[in-house]
Amino acid sequence: MCHSRSCHPTMTILQAPTPAPSTNPGPRRGSGPEIFTFDPLPEPAAAPAGRPSASRGHRKRSRRVLYPRVVRRQLPVEEPNPAKRLLFLLLTIVFCQILMAEEGVPAPLPPEDAPNAASLAPTPVSPVLEPFNLTSEPSDYALDLSTFLQQHPAAF
């Protein structure tokens, strides 16, 4: 296969590179000592101090990403809600009324109409009725249990 423009084989002549005569007496660019020594390289003292980045060429940037150390995101300020405040106020009032309620005292009834002579008279106090325990068994049940335990002491 031919890789050139014409399909004819081409020949190139390689010439040996000839060193160009150097006019600068200092060290050549990119060359170090021909023999390795532990001596430090001489620094060029006559380097122009213009722009150091321009003389070095393109420098590779660091790949380290600089994030801030710790950033706490603050939540937005919650707007006051009047309906929520009113709800908490009403719940507080109901809770206080439940705590301060006295047991066994009936709640006073508000007058239905305007005050008249009958309402000014003292009303008789109704007797406080004790609540009945409808789930309690008659006392003969307790006697039956005691007689059962006397007859069968090893049952329990």
Curated annotation (Swiss-Prot):
The modification Phosphothreonine is found at T18, T123. GO terms for biological process: DNA damage response; negative regulation of apoptotic process. InterPro entries: IEX-1. The keyword Membrane applies. The chain crosses the membrane at residues 83-99. Residues 1-82 are cytoplasmic. It is found in: Membrane. Residues 100-156 are extracellular. Residues 7-17 have a biased composition (Polar residues). Residues 56-65 have a biased composition (Basic residues). Glycosylated. Phosphorylated at Thr-18, Thr-123 and Ser-126 by MAPK1/ERK2 and probably MAPK3/ERK1. Upon phosphorylation by MAPK1/ERK2 and MAPK3/ERK1, acquires the ability to inhibit cell death induced by various stimuli. Keywords: Glycoprotein, Membrane, Phosphoprotein, Signal-anchor, Transmembrane, Transmembrane helix. The keyword Protein biosynthesis does not apply. It is a single-pass type II membrane protein. The modification Phosphoserine is found at S31, S126. Glycans are attached at N133. Residues 44-55 have a biased composition (Low complexity). One of its GO terms (cellular component) is membrane. Residues 1-65 are annotated as: Disordered. Belongs to the IER3 family. May play a role in the ERK signaling pathway by inhibiting the dephosphorylation of ERK by phosphatase PP2A-PPP2R5C holoenzyme. Also acts as an ERK downstream effector mediating survival. As a member of the NUPR1/RELB/IER3 survival pathway, may provide pancreatic ductal adenocarcinoma with remarkable resistance to cell stress, such as starvation or gemcitabine treatment. PANTHER family: IMMEDIATE EARLY RESPONSE 3 (PTHR16915), RADIATION-INDUCIBLE IMMEDIATE-EARLY GENE IEX-1 (PTHR16915:SF0). Interacts with the PPP2R5C-PP2A holoenzyme and ERK kinases; regulates ERK dephosphorylation. This is Radiation-inducible immediate-early gene IEX-1.
